[in-house]
Swiss-Prot record:
Protein name per its UniProtKB record: Anti-sigma-YlaC factor YlaD
Keyword Cell membrane: yes
Cofactor: Zn(2+)
UniProt source species: Bacillus subtilis (strain 168)
Keyword terms, alphabetized: Cell membrane, Membrane, Metal-binding, Transmembrane, Transmembrane helix, Zinc
Gene: ylaD
This protein's GO CC annotations: plasma membrane
Co-factor: note: Binds 1 Zn(2+) ion per subunit.
Listed InterPro entries: Znf_put (IPR027383)
Keyword field contains Cell wall biogenesis/degradation: no
Localisation per UniProt entry: Cell membrane
Pfam family membership, one: zf-HC2
One example GO MF annotation: metal ion binding
């Protein structure tokens, strides 16, 4: 089996989703090919994900937070004005009819 195919199948092999024959062929290839074995070792190592708060802080600097507060504040004000105008129009129409 070529390195290309083994590298393509490594995620399935690690998850245990390969057939027995395929697992055997991959294991034999890993014994002979140090490059694929290194890739296997790298993929098999567990890794830590950053905490959600750390990621949030990295992507939301203070200026962006201020911008969002202003933007959504204005959006709410506009929506309230449009709602008020619609209610006023409905009252005027009701009084005229």
């Amino acid at each position: 089996m070529t390195c290309f195919l083994v590298r393509d199948l490594l995620p399935l092999y690690l998850e245990g989703d390969c057939k027995r024959e395929t697992e055997h062929v991959i294991e034999e290839h890993l014994k002979m090919c140090s490059s694929c074995r290194d890739m296997y070792d790298t993929m098999a190592e567990p890794f830590e994900l950053e905490s959600e708060q750390a990621v949030e802080e990295a992507y939301l600097p203070e200026e962006e937070l201020r911008f969002k507060q202003r933007y959504y504040g204005l959006l709410i004000m506009k929506a309230a004005c449009w709602f008020g105008a619609a209610v006023a129009m409905m009252l005027i129409i009701k009084l005229l009819i």
